[in-house]
Design a protein with these regions (language model features):
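Enriched but not universal
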Residues: 22-28, 362-378
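Bacterial N-terminal signal peptides
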Residues: 10-21
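Bacterial N-terminal signal peptides that target proteins for export
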Residues: 1-11
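Coiled-coil-like amphipathic alpha-helices with heptad-repeat character
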Residues: 3, 14, 370-372
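Glycan-processing catalytic domains of CAZymes
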Residues: 28-364
Length: 378
């Protein structure tokens, strides 16, 4: 065999080996453009923050860590903050972020929210620069909504054509736009990922039966969120709120959160999920790592401070008037505040997933028992 043929052969064998590794792990053999590990890690990302306390800040009593070491509010398109986030995401070895543009941001379905997609696109521009000069690549994808069909707050959303039209906008404004790099968009089997938030259990069937054109949507790998009813996650969904059953095992994607909407009154329903001093997050990761790994682990969320699901470092010591209260303080079992407890755990547990490192200890908790978690891929 000549050297050139040997090289071609080895290049051909590697994708097959990677695919077989995923099959042995129980993962779906889908192909992605992540960083090459058998399991990719994605995380929801919110850009819906405006300068001087605008945007969705009035609803949030969380104040995230800023590049200068202080805690406070920031603009979703602030270059220094975006670059800081990208640095931390890369250090954590997260493969892609999923933009929350579910509130009619594209095609003007929610005119009051159009500004949010512009903030998201500002992050895309910084990712283009980041990926040019860093070995760990950060990809991105977009989440849109079809939940608003028939909602009087979204008068132009009248049918499942909303998916086609938002897909067209994402393609034209981002994926095919030369201001960005198509290689930076997270892809599944060669198609850019587009997640659709819908609260109907039969959302997939409704979309499949929609009679209008789907030329733009067919260019995407369409996936779903919230289809267990009432926005809770079903098996194979990429979000939204966790089902009461906890992590739902699935070969393609498994979704987990540290908590969700814990400002709501106890007993308010599925959306009220307490963090329990970090135990809820730890237990969710234990379930993922104790079973054959999926192709994608999806975390909700990096910085969703309005629905109480963030893991990025934040100060939770103050209740700001007129925000969504009460929030659940980020305390360990030692009853001390630990602003970075969820981010530190996220970084550590991804090392366990990828490299078999010992499980991290949640801040303020007793040491984890045993050594490395049970990893079911080679």
């Amino acid at each position: 065999m000549t050297l050139s043929k040997a090289i071609k052969f080895s290049l051909g064998v590697f994708p097959i080996f990677l695919q077989l590794s995923c099959i042995e792990a129980g993962a779906s053999p889908i192909k992605t453009n992540g960083n090459g590990d058998p399991t990719d890690v994605g995380i929801w990302y919110c850009a819906n923050w405006d300068a001087n306390g605008g945007g969705w800040w009035p609803m949030a009593s969380y104040r995230p860590l800023l590049p200068d070491g202080s805690y406070g509010m920031h603009d979703g398109s602030d270059v220094a903050v975006i670059d800081f986030h990208l640095q931390k995401l890369a250090e954590a070895q997260i493969d892609f972020i999923l933009f929350d543009d579910t509130n009619g941001d594209f095609n003007g379905y929610g005119p009051q929210n159009v500004w949010i997609k512009e903030k998201s696109k500002a992050v895309c521009a910084r990712i283009k620069l980041w990926n040019r000069s860093h070995s760990w690549k950060i990809k991105y994808a977009f989440a849109i909504g079809s939940f608003m069909i028939g909602d009087r707050e979204y008068p132009t959303a009248t049918s499942y054509d909303v998916i086609e039209q938002q897909a067209r906008c994402v393609a034209q404004e981002v994926f095919l736009n030369s201001d960005y790099d198509t290689n930076d968009y997270y892809q599944i089997d060669g198609k850019p990922l587009l997640v659709v938030l819908d609260y109907n259990k039969d959302a997939r069937t409704r979309w499949a039966n929609h009679p209008s054109g789907k030329a733009w949507a067919n260019r995407f790998a369409i996936r779903w969120a919230g289809t267990s009813g009432g926005y809770s996650v079903a098996a194979g969904d990429y979000g939204w709120a966790m089902n009461a059953a906890g992590v739902l095992l699935h070969p393609e994607v498994e979704y987990l959160q540290p908590g969700h909407d814990n400002h709501l009154p106890a007993g308010a329903g599925w959306m009220h999920t307490l963090r329990k001093n970090g135990d809820y997050y730890v237990n969710n990761w234990d379930r993922i790592l104790g079973n054959p790994l999926p192709r994608i682990v999806m975390i909700g969320a990096f910085n969703d401070y309005t629905e109480d699901s963030a893991v990025w470092t934040a100060d939770t010591s103050v209740d700001y008037p007129k925000s969504r209260l009460p929030i659940e303080r980020w305390q360990g079992h030692d009853v001390q505040l630990h602003p970075s407890m969820y981010w530190d755990y996220t970084v550590g547990i991804i090392r366990t997933l990828r490299h078999g490192a010992p499980k991290p200890i949640m801040a303020g908790s007793a040491p984890a028992s045993g050594g490395a978690a049970d990893r079911r891929h080679p």
